[in-house]
Amino acid sequence: MKKMPRIMFVVLLSLSFLYSFPAEAAKPFKVPSSVASISKENTYPNASQDQPLLQPSELTAELFKTTSVPIENTHLIKMLNESSISGTPLAVGYRATIFLGRWALSYDSNETVANWEYKKVNTNHIDNRGGNKTVIGKYVQKQQVKVSGGLTAKVPNPEDVKTLMMQKAIQKTKLPLAFDTVIGAGTKRDQSYHVSPKKAASLHAYAPAINEKGKVTYGEVYLVLKGNKRKLVVKNVTSQGIGAWIPVQDHLTFGFQGMN
């Protein structure tokens, strides 16, 4: 059998790389069957945090194209959206540099995982040890409980960082998230739990939370005007690793534990 010429082999090998395998689709965030929404049953009306992303205006979008540093901070976008620059040609040689502040510009997510039993919020006991027929127990929230998350480290502009992280976590999990959520007293569910005679059981309820980890990017933002041209300049760009716990709003994880 004749050997394949080396040049032909290299060509064929190179051509094989032109065909790319289809990328594996991102798997949806899996929620266990033990987790249930209580948005309709909750006696405390939590305010929704799932706000639509603020879109840059025509001027803001034009300015963003002048810098290679990604900007996702909604407060900075809003400030630029509310600004206006006259279209009248400025004097030849005119130049101005306006310092807009040091901002948390963007957040890159590295890991998003859930703790479905982040905080125990309620326990209902069903004692049927003295009974001779099956009894039914249900979840009833005994008292109002506030569940809070937060950043795992101190960083500059913490509120902006929390907003950036929550936006990314909501996009990845498709869950309603908030750094503070409340389960109101008297909240109930219709689902029944059966306890046999001579038995007892406990129904535990937990508030789930998302653990978000990634990197936040900071930078000093300047608006530079020169003649009739305008651009954004970002200086002293730094990045910092950060994590956060973000509770899942109006959701509970239920655990039913039987005992003799």
Model-assigned labels for residue ranges:
Residues M1-P28:
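Sec-dependent N-terminal signal peptides of Gram-positive bacterial secreted proteins and lipoproteins
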Residues A26-T152, K174-H194, A201-S202, A207-E212, ...:
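Deployable pore-forming modules of oligomeric membrane-permeabilizing proteins
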Residues M1-M4, M8, M79, M165-M166, ...:
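Detector for methionine-enriched segments
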Residues K133-R189, N228-K229, V233-N260:
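Membrane-insertion modules used to breach or fuse lipid bilayers
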